[in-house]
Curated annotation (Swiss-Prot):
Pfam family, one: DarP
Protein name: Dual-action ribosomal maturation protein DarP
Broad class of where this protein is predominantly found: cytoplasm
Family designation: Belongs to the DarP family.
Length: 195
């Protein structure tokens, strides 16, 4: 039973409507968790006792049975601390934000690739202004090869390679990291020494 504070007249506990809204929020969170891949689930701070329930919910595909299993998962999730559920929500939000940034970065890479193929050296100069660490000669050669492949109706090998080079160039900047060729070389040489 809910009680009232005699002095202020306010209720001590949540209303029944608020409890329902909270339960629906937890159910929606459970649906999101069930829709994730195992690799994505591994990155989230999910308590070990919830993992079997998530796996069971993924396994069941019949509509009503799946819905019932989701409700069962939500019941177990409501037993967890609110801080645990908030941590899961925050991690999901961070993952979705990272995904949106990666998609936006891929679109920028595709735009630059199309611009390089359409405008040539003019676009290359603009790219080098934004990314001075880019290899001018490599990009110029790839653009020339991609244009030749397109003219001869050959497979777009250089076209794809331009994408890979631009992605490697823009990814560290998009994620806020500083990377250079010198940073990558020691890792490769260490791995070569171990073999």
């Amino acid at each position: 039973m809910r009680g009232r504070d005699e002095e202020t007249g306010e209720f001590h506990d949540k209303s029944r409507s608020q409890n329902r809204r909270d339960a629906l929020d937890v159910l929606a969170l459970g649906e999101k968790l069930v829709s994730l891949t195992p690799a994505q689930l591994a990155r989230l701070p999910i308590p070990e006792d919830l993992l079997p329930h998530i796996a069971e919910c993924k396994r069941i595909t019949a509509h009503i049975a799946h819905k019932r299993q989701l409700a069962f998962l939500a019941k177990h999730m409501r037993r967890e601390e609110e801080a645990t559920l908030d941590a899961i929500r925050d991690a999901l939000d961070a993952n979705s934000e990272t995904g949106r940034r990666e998609v936006a970065m891929m679109h920028r890479v595709e735009d630059w690739r199309e611009r390089l193929l359409a405008e040539g050296d003019k676009a290359l100069a603009a790219l080098l202004d934004d990314y001075p660490q880019a290899d001018r000669q490599q990009l110029r050669t790839l653009v020339r090869n991609a244009q030749a492949e397109k003219a001869k109706n050959k497979p777009p090998r250089a076209y794809r390679e331009i994408f890979q080079v631009l992605r490697a160039l823009m990814l560290p900047a998009a994620l806020g990291l500083k990377a250079s060729a010198e940073d990558a070389d020691p890792v490769e040489s260490d791995e070569a020494d171990e073999d």
